């Protein structure tokens, strides 16, 4: 696709996304992911982004998580816990305010970037059908979920691929409490990781010749 054609297509797609994200909360309460590869941007940068569509305003806190030994990650969604066996990487974070999570010290991290240049944005909520649910149900008691994805990726991963493999391993081992998509990037590549069911996941390296806007198509809800 020629650059001008792609820009026209992206303008239309982004306009549609604005319509979705400007809709009342009753109409949609999920997220929207964006991907624009380097060859389609004026400055040669890749853009991986996500907005939260669950409310008109989503207040966030910004900060730096220091490097620490043997970090214990735990969730306020479930009873999930996992302890690292190494020294974590220092990273910046965008988190929910603590008072939204019972004043826990490790409130849900929506995005961030670590000292190795690995970034993560989590999540876009998805769903599974009845057949998948019967075969591999979600682990709502102790499964990993969006509360921990970004913190674990940023604290433990030196590359995007390493982050993908780590989250995949944790999903297989502990199960997941929800179906989600998250993006993980480093200076060389970007990935979308999809948690499909209780213990199944898939990941795709985002292509250099295609752009996308994903308005949570599998989970859209419309007002009557």
Residue ranges and their predicted role:
Residues 144-160, 165-166:
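N-terminal leader/propeptide and maturation segments of large enzyme subunits in energy/redox metabolism
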Residues 12-15, 19, 181-182:
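Intrinsically disordered and other compositionally biased segments
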Residues 18, 91, 152-154, 202:
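Hydrophobic transmembrane signal anchors and adjacent membrane-proximal interface regions, especially
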Residues 17-27:
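C-terminal segment of classical bacterial N-terminal signal peptides
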Residues 30-146, 166-224:
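A contiguous strand-loop segment
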Residues 2-13:
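Bacterial N-terminal signal peptides that target proteins for export
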